[in-house]
UniProtKB/Swiss-Prot annotation:
Bilayer topology annotation: Single-pass membrane protein
Taxon lineage: Bacteria, Pseudomonadati, Spirochaetota, Spirochaetia, Spirochaetales
Protein name: Uncharacterized protein TP_0031
Keyword terms, alphabetized: Membrane, Transmembrane, Transmembrane helix
Annotated compartments: Membrane
Transmembrane segments: 65-86
GO CC terms in record: membrane
Amino acid sequence: MDLGQRVVRVIPLAPLPVRVYNAGGLRVDFFPRFFGRSPQGVGVGFARLKLSASVGSNGFRLTRAVWIFWLCFLVSGLSRAFLVYFLSVIRI
């Protein structure tokens, strides 16, 4: 059984969301599922992601915007990591 590409150690996390707020009033709830270590590094897996905007006392869910936001978040993180790596290689 090859464990090279699989998570070696998995620590279950509590089902409490990790909330991130921005200045516009949008609330992003990350629901962590596991925290694991693999040969590639340390990562956190999320079971689902909820994006809501508070309007008055209650909020409404933006289900399609959740995946758009998550995709933009991943792309911006990858592009930032690539930019830092590229600048460190060419030493500007």
